[in-house]
């Protein structure tokens, strides 16, 4: 058995052991017959060994063909077409006599796909295992099939599972045919890919343009909304300012009317006094009434000139001018209120009774800035000097109608003693040092003045 196994391992692929005893030489024929008759179990073992060897070769070739033909339907078809000879091997196993006869006639069965052809008629046929120039038959090239054509072919054959497309023979895949087909497939695929890429680029460009347009439209709408909102706010503010200006203008007009009425009340009695020639009274130049009249007339002239020059000016400039004028009027009114109590005694002094004309001369002489009127009694035209009085507090000399006011102010200034701030007492407040300073007294608390430096 070990010898048979070694022999089978060294045999070539397409060669099988002969079983025809007639081809053996004559002297060994008797021995062979006795051997066949005596040991049938050895023949059965030999047949089993041969069958196992053929099966192993078949399985190896199936694996190689599975790698070459990837399409499942082609794979099954090639298996069906190329490996139909196991039936023959089974027949040979079942009928060893016919096998021996076939071998006797010169027919041999090989393990390849051409095993069922007779050897004599197979001279023109090139075996599959023989190599040709430029093509490796052990590893042929895989067919290039486009996936679309594959999908259509599969879709067309799904209905009928028994009908398979005839796969191309291995010899059909030559280098020239493969190159032509490959170029055609690449050209078709390139055109399709270029078209799809162009469509995608156009779609992406249109989409980006649409997105940019939408963004610009949204930004424009937001800007318009913001402008509308600001316009509404500005209109509201403008209405408020106009109402405020109207209110200020009405207030100013009312204040002006009130001031005019007060002025008429003040001026009418003075004009009546002036109209009375018998009771002539000389009004001092610097009296508060004269100043007020002068300021009022000046303001009126300014208002007239301003109104003529600013007729076409804006409302804001006009309102500013009105506000300044109102402030000025209030300031004048406050000054008048302050001067009223001072002017009353001076008026009384300037208006003595009419029975004594000498008193009128005396009162008129008290004003240093006013010229003296001639005496009504026809006395001499000599001008009397104004009478001066001395202040009891400071010793200065003043006119009699000013002396009283100065004396009041001077007495207040002299009588008020300013309290000097003592930082040492402020620091000692609330401590035992304060008690000590109070016990010691203010005389001792006074610090001696620093000595004058005479280093020069």
From Swiss-Prot:
Co-factor requirement: Zn(2+)
Molecular function (Gene Ontology), one example: zinc ion binding
Region (Disordered): 16-46, 85-113, 336-388
Zinc finger residue extent: C2HC/C3H-type: 387-416
Cross-referenced PROSITE patterns: ZF_C2HC_C3H
Keyword Zinc: yes
Record's keyword terms, sorted: Coiled coil, Metal-binding, Zinc, Zinc-finger
Coiled-coil region list: 211-265
Stated name of the protein: Zinc finger C2HC domain-containing protein 1C
Organism the protein comes from: Homo sapiens
């Amino acid at each position: 058995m070990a010898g048979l196994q070694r022999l089978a391992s060294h045999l070539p692929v397409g060669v099988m052991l002969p079983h025809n005893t007639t081809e053996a030489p004559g002297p060994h024929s008797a021995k062979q017959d006795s051997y066949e008759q005596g040991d049938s179990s050895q023949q059965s073992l030999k047949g089993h060994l041969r069958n196992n060897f053929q099966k192993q070769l078949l399985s190896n070739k199936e694996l190689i063909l599975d790698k070459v033909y990837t399409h499942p339907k082609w794979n099954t078809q090639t298996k069906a077409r190329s490996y139909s000879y196991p039936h023959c091997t089974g027949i040979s196993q079942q009928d060893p006599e016919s096998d021996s006869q076939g071998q006797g006639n010169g027919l041999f069965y090989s393990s390849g796909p051409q095993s069922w052809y007779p050897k004599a008629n197979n001279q023109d046929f090139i075996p599959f295992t023989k190599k040709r120039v430029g093509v490796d038959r052990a590893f042929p090239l895989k067919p290039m099939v486009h996936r679309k054509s594959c999908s259509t072919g599969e879709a067309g054959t799904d209905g009928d599972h028994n009908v398979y497309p005839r796969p191309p023979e291995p010899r059909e895949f030559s280098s020239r045919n493969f190159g032509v087909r490959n170029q055609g497939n690449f050209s078709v695929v390139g055109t399709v890919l270029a078209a799809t890429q162009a469509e995608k680029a156009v779609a992406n460009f249109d989409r980006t343009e649409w997105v940019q347009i939408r963004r610009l439209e949204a930004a424009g709408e937001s800007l318009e909304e913001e402008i509308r909102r600001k316009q509404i706010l500005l209109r509201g503010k403008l209405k408020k300012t106009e109402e405020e200006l109207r209110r200020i203008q009405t207030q100013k007009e009312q204040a002006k009317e009130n001031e005019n009425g007060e002025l008429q009340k003040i001026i009418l009695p003075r004009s009546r006094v002036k109209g009375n020639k018998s009771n002539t009274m000389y009004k001092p130049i610097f009296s508060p009434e004269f100043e007020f009249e002068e300021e009022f007339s000046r303001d009126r002239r300014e208002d007239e000139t301003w109104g003529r020059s600013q007729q076409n000016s804006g409302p804001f400039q006009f309102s500013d001018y009105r506000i300044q004028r109102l402030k000025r009027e209030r300031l004048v009114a406050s000054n008048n209120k302050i001067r009223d109590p001072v002017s009353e005694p001076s008026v009384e002094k300037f208006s003595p009774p009419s029975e004594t004309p000498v008193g009128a001369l005396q009162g008129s002489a008290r004003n240093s800035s006013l010229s003296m009127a001639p005496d009504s009694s026809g006395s001499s035209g000599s001008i009397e000097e104004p009478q001066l009085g001395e202040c009891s507090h400071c010793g200065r000399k003043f006119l009699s109608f000013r002396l009283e006011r100065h004396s009041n102010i001077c007495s207040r200034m002299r009588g008020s003693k300013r309290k000097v701030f003592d930082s040492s007492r402020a620091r000692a407040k609330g401590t035992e040092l304060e008690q000590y300073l109070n016990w010691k007294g203010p005389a001792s608390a006074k610090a001696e003045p620093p000595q004058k430096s005479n280093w020069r």
